[in-house]
Amino acid sequence: MITRRSFVVTGLAGAAATLARPSLLLASRARYDVVLRGGHVVDGSGRAGIDADVAIANGRVAMIGRSLRDSGRVEIDVRGQVVAPGFVDIHSHGDGTLWQDPRAESVIRQGITTIVVGQDGFSRAPATSDENGTRSFRSFGDLWDALGNLRPAVNVASMVGLGTVRSFAVGDANRPATAAEMRRMTQVVDDALANGACGVSSGLEYTPGAFAPREELVALCRPLARHRLPYATHLRNEDDWLVDAVGEAIAVARDAGCPLQISHLKTQGPRNWGKLDEVFARVAAARRSGQDVTFDRYPYLAYQTGLTNLFPVWSRDGGVRELLSRVGQADAGERIRRETLAKVELIGGWDNVMISGVSSAEDKPAEGKRLGGYAAALGRDPYDVAVDLLRRSGGNVGMVGFAMSERNLERILAHPYGMVCTDGGAFAIEGPARRGHPHPRGLGSFPRVLARYVRERRALSLEQAIRKMSSLPAARVGLRGRGWLARGFAADVVVFDAATIEDRATFADPFQYP
């Protein structure tokens, strides 16, 4: 993991405006660097909070106690505020924009001090080349060196993505790996873990990761057992075959002997909302048998992915160019259309598909538009518009799909083995990190949990929520000395007003900070 700031105090939703002006004291008279006075300390353990002072020295929590006598060079009055560990985003795509804007404004402003990237089977290392300036690296050592030079505003941990590993060794073809390729991939995973990767991720709805059979996944996850690090998976299916996909993930982790983290757990499409009980039952059964199974989720009812993900996996064999070629073929094209329309119907139609980003300047007006209405305004069929968007952007088209249940979301967030994530990037309301029309989760997830699901709906307590945002994810990926407010731990600290904290980013206007 690369670290940037050992001490961050973030005021959320106006909390900074209520903080007293720091009183500066002479260094010779101060024992601590910073003392936060009189806040309500929720330490990340899940236990009830206490009113206390928090003293910080040399980048670490030095003391927590009521009315500490010794002073700090900087003293901050935080009475009426919650003082908590800096949040850990266990499923982040912040590695996509950090290189252009290392300030990570949308991350820091949510109180997130550590992001775990390399998700859904894609990581910045290992790669054979830095294609299209995407900042990919030959090894994890090279990645850490580059991040060290970049000095981003947040701590960064990364998993190694099995889709990236497969592309590195096998390419993008839909075929089994050879014995030699398996040896190479296993070595790559071993090397990544030895050089600081905090787990292994897969994206089994994306190519080339979707082409990996269970046996390949098991073999590549076995090195995790030695490190006691998790296999984090974007399941092979999150709708009609969700229960089977959960079963596959549990089986992979069982056979590999490693912990399992189910990424952004969801039941997609109204006809699948009733499957959550069976999913929870599968998780409970696995845990009773001795497996370590947990999951994460962001607090919204829509997901974000690539528009190509609406198209069947078999049609994406070989990449976007092959997909677009097959679309134009008589038999294959008709089958692709039929299966794509079935997928769209599952989530409620084209008006539940919003375009979140395109690379073609010609199609920028489509960003933020529902595809059904956008196509109607053009007098065209939505499927044909989708294909044209992909063609003109070389497949680089993002989408938001509206397909989830509020009740299920609350149950997932409140579940004892659930954690909070953004599944979003690092954005800014100005500069190079303002891109497209993204899902609001990248700017509002953690404040939204605290505002909507703790304060308003009371789906979980403040202490439970903070634990799911700090100590649980930190422990999950082996971050020692982070995720708790405790003596000797890194002074990653967030301060906020629990009565007023609020997310402001919306699907209509995502570029708004909390």
Tell me what each language-model feature is.
Residues 191-249:
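Divalent metal-binding pocket/active-site signature
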Residues 96-124, 129-159, 177-195, 218-226:
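Alpha-helical scaffold segments that flank or form the walls of functional sites
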Residues 24, 28-34, 41-86, 503-506:
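Histidine-rich, glycine-flanked metal-binding segment
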Residues 1-14:
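N-terminal secretory signal peptides and thylakoid transit peptides that target proteins
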Residues 39, 59, 80, 111, ...:
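Divalent metal-coordination and catalytic microenvironments
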Residues 39, 326, 411-417, 422-423, ...:
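C-terminal cap of metal-dependent C-N hydrolases
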Residues 147, 153-155, 159-179, 185-206, ...:
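Active-site neighborhoods of metal-dependent hydrolases
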